[in-house]
């Protein structure tokens, strides 16, 4: 009977995840139709290209972290305090890994677009700038939202994702209507700020979740560095953009290395990887 009950709850969970995934796809499809009708087919291509860059490279990091993070969170799912500690730890590590990459992305996005596509796609830079800032909020909300899966609350997970998809679509429609492609980047940032507030309050009310002081410190420092990078690309002319940008990237890398070393011993990990390559 216990096995049947567990199997049933897993089936319900799987169904809810699939359903929320379907709603996300429908929202993305409706947005593409709107862009095509309001703007043109070229803008649909530009939109897809911009978010492919962001989602592909950042998504790889999320996937790699998720394979290790979800099983560990599932083990402590019944203990709210341990869940809180693990979510904070994962949020810290996600930010420490992502922040230098995102800041480098802000500074060198033009080159990335030209290398991956062509100079004809440079009209998406504004959209990518704003969306890159949104990844900071996506990373943290991603770490929190996993707790709904770990605790097996399928309905809560579904409604959380459902409302997220609804306002993501609404903000994207408004963003494109009033701001074109750049407006889509701004709407991405706003949507993930709201989504983070949403998952934080659900986790706080249901599981007494709160952010640790060390997480807040990392978030503020790395986000301020990213904001400085954002200001540099918007306000300062080349080649000074790259000079100041490299300084910001260097500081972010140094800070991330220092913090990661105290948490997971990153120096030993790097040495281990290098030794494996030497043996090959």
What are these regions (language model features)?
Residues 1-28, 68-85, 206-220, 266-271, ...:
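Interhelical loop/hinge segments that connect adjacent transmembrane helices in multipass membrane
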Residues 20, 24, 28, 51, ...:
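Short runs within selected transmembrane alpha-helices of multi-pass transporters and secretion channels
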Residues 4-71, 134, 138-141:
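Transmembrane helical elements of multi-pass membrane transporters/channels
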Residues 61, 87-138, 169-177, 234:
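Alpha-helical transmembrane segments of multi-pass membrane transport and lipid-handling proteins
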Residues 25, 169-173, 224-239:
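Hydrophobic alpha-helical transmembrane segments in multi-pass integral membrane proteins
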Residues 42-45, 88, 122-125, 154-155, ...:
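Residues that define the loop-to-transmembrane-helix transition and helix capping
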């Amino acid at each position: 009977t216990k096995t049947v009950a567990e199997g049933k709850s897993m089936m319900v969970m799987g169904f809810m995840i699939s359903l929320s995934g379907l709603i996300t796809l429908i929202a993305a499809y409706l947005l593409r139709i709107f862009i095509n009708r309001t703007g043109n087919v070229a803008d649909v291509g530009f939109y897809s290209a911009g978010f492919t860059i962001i989602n592909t490279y950042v998504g790889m990091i999320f996937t790699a972290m998720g394979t290790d993070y979800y099983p560990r969170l599932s083990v402590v799912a019944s203990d709210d305090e341990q869940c809180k500690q693990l979510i904070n730890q994962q949020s810290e590590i996600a930010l420490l890994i992502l922040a230098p990459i995102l800041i480098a992305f802000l500074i060198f996005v033009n080159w990335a677009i030209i290398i991956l596509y062509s100079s004809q796609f440079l009209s998406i830079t504004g959209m990518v700038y704003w969306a890159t800032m949104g990844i900071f909020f996506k990373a943290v909300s991603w770490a929190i939202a996993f707790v709904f899966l770990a605790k097996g609350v399928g309905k809560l997970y579904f409604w959380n994702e459902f409302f997220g998809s609804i306002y993501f679509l609404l903000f994207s429609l408004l963003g494109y209507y009033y701001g074109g492609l750049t407006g889509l980047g701004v709407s991405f940032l706003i949507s993930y700020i709201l989504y983070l507030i949403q998952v934080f309050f659900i986790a706080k009310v249901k599981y007494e979740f709160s952010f640790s002081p060390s997480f807040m410190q990392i978030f503020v420092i790395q986000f301020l560095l990213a904001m400085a990078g954002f200001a540099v690309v918007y306000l300062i002319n080349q080649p000074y953009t790259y000079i100041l940008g490299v300084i910001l990237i260097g500081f972010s890398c140094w800070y991330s290395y220092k913090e990661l070393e105290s948490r997971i011993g990153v120096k030993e990990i790097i040495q281990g990887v290098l030794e494996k390559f030497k043996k090959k």
